[in-house]
Design a protein with these regions (language model features):
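PLD/PLD-like phosphodiesterase catalytic module centered on the HKD motif
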Residues: 4, 18-22, 30-217
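Mobile "lid/hinge" segments at catalytic clefts and subdomain interfaces of large enzymes
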Residues: 1-17
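Solvent-exposed, charged helical/coil patches
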Residues: 10, 26-27
Length: 217
């Protein structure tokens, strides 16, 4: 497959500094990943300015790369809906008037320490989703070998949207919501009662597959 052929090039590079060229599916840092993500954000921004569908949902551990952060803020100002699910540091303020309008930021701090990264972009009729090893930070983008790979199968893409992105955007138990000053408040405090936990829902669905028997409650 294209991905395995690309992975062969990556391993050859790691073993011998073999030049990586002509990749079919993988996007590799420090070579193309930052540029690829910027291109997707700019495409969403252009769609928003044209009055077309414009959506970004990102799930990661940290977002501190300045140029990517500014591009996301610009997308929000242009009218795109931008949701950032960032467990740790995030330098994009949520909904700051005149700077990051249209941007929402939340952190999920539950029982499990997660490391999944999902990047979703919709620009007009075009949808793109990537899974990745990289956070949007300078070290990952420019100093380490990191990978992102596209989710091209529509059914698998929708499954990730439903089971992960949508669930985490509606988490009513473990979420912390950023305000326009960069401060976080617990979603439980904001709603005055706990709601559903995205992590709990995933464990209830898949916990038995790990051989641990009953799902965590």
């Amino acid at each position: 497959s294209q991905i395995t052929a690309d992975m062969e090039q990556v391993f050859q590079h790691l073993a011998s500094q073999h030049r990586i060229s002509g990749l079919h599916a993988l996007v590799v840092a420090p070579f193309q990943l930052h540029r690829c993500m910027m291109q997707h954000v700019h495409a969403v921004t252009a769609s928003a300015r044209a009055g077309q569908a414009a959506r970004i949902v990102l799930k990661m551990n940290a977002l501190t790369d300045e140029s990517l952060a500014l591009a996301l803020a610009e997308a929000g100002r242009a009218g795109a809906r931008v949701d950032l699910i960032v467990r740790g540091a995030c330098v994009v303020p949520a909904g700051a008037a005149g700077f990051s309008d249209g941007v929402r930021v939340r952190s999920i701090i539950g029982r499990y320490l997660e490391h999944s990264r999902i990047f979703y972009f919709r620009a007009g009729a075009a949808e793109h989703m990537y899974l990745s090893s990289a956070d949007w930070i300078v070290r990952n983008m420019f100093r380490l070998i990191e990978l992102a790979w596209p989710v091209r199968d529509p059914a698998q893409r929708q499954r990730l949207i439903d089971e992960t992105l949508t669930a985490y955007l509606h988490d009513g138990r473990d979420a912390w919501i950023m305000d326009d000053q960069g401060h976080y408040r617990s979603v439980v405090d904001l709603r005055r009662q706990p709601g559903a936990s995205a992590q709990h829902a995933l464990v209830a669905r898949y916990g038995g597959l790990a051989g641990g028997g009953a799902a965590w409650t």
